């Protein structure tokens, strides 16, 4: 829990199996929310949000944070991971103190803003003040909001560090520092920013990390800023492919994918679907081709203006747009309950991204279907994904319509 410059961590902090998985050292299970001794207003917010009983990660992950332990939680996207750390954070806040007590980092603006919405909903009866500090929004708004006082800040590394560095985000009263999607946050792109932020935090701050995947090399990085963490593991091959039917369609050549997608539209009644492409250019190209053939669809990627992206997400969540073509910008943590189908128009470059993509199609045990377009050049990549998750992806059957119903 202490700043590593003051107390160098030992190698015992994170146990890593030869498979690259963390070894769980915490097995206490809490069967119901009432048994966590939560404040009445927080419990009321949890039930009002629609939760009835905690999911597997919530049964294991909330209590160690409440008890003050640094915590590493590994669980699949869509299992209630966000609510795990949000519920714990809301319980630790002193609402009479008008100061930031929880700082939470996420890798993307969309994920940070979604976490803020979950926190405000769960903390509705607690009168929670939670602000999202993300790039692409007004710096002046951040300054004014932080100056007026908030209990919790959710943000992306660049903007959060900026607010810390300029003194607008004060962390004198910080109790809990959370990183969501820890694998992404600690990867090469964010590692330096995370360390710069951590150096500015109180020495005794409690740290929690949650993610669907935690590669071996990432776990070793956690020794630099965690002390004797409680480790909670959902084994990689159990990470969720349960409830999600996975298929592939052989398309031989890349240029045949478009016709294959059209064929699928003609045979499937799709309630709501996400189509993933590997590049922004590819998203634009596919969207243009679909619209030229009179198929209604939306598209979103990182080159778009932040406000435009928010409008597109609102339309998709409301159901006014039923097909969304996107890059991996959307793959981590976007909660769209109605999605019944995910199509990987392009197989992901990294096997670890696969679970984030198809996790959108079966949230909280809701059944979903994932269809992967596989060219001859993609066969090796498909086999890598199967090995990585210890799963088998079958060829799409003729009766796919029955499976979706």
From Swiss-Prot:
Motif (DEAD box): 180-183
Helicase ATP-binding domain ranges (all copies): 62-232
Catalysis performed (reactions): ATP + H2O = ADP + phosphate + H(+)
Chain residues that bind ATP: 75-82
Record flagged with keyword Repeat: no
Family matches, as SMART domains: DEXDc, HELICc
Alphabetical list of InterPro entries matching this protein: DEAD/DEAH_box_helicase_dom (IPR011545), EIF4A_DEADc (IPR044728), Helicase_ATP-bd (IPR014001), Helicase_C-like (IPR001650), P-loop_NTPase (IPR027417), RNA-helicase_DEAD-box_CS (IPR000629), RNA_helicase_DEAD_Q_motif (IPR014014)
Residue ranges of domain Helicase C-terminal in the record: 243-404
Record carries keyword Hydrolase: yes
EC number: 3.6.4.13
Purpose: ATP-dependent RNA helicase which is a subunit of the eIF4F complex involved in cap recognition and is required for mRNA binding to ribosome. In the current model of translation initiation, eIF4A unwinds RNA secondary structures in the 5'-UTR of mRNAs which is necessary to allow efficient binding of the small ribosomal subunit, and subsequent scanning for the initiator codon.
Stated family: Belongs to the DEAD box helicase family. eIF4A subfamily.
Protein name per Swiss-Prot or TrEMBL: Eukaryotic initiation factor 4A
Gene assigned in the entry: EIF4-A
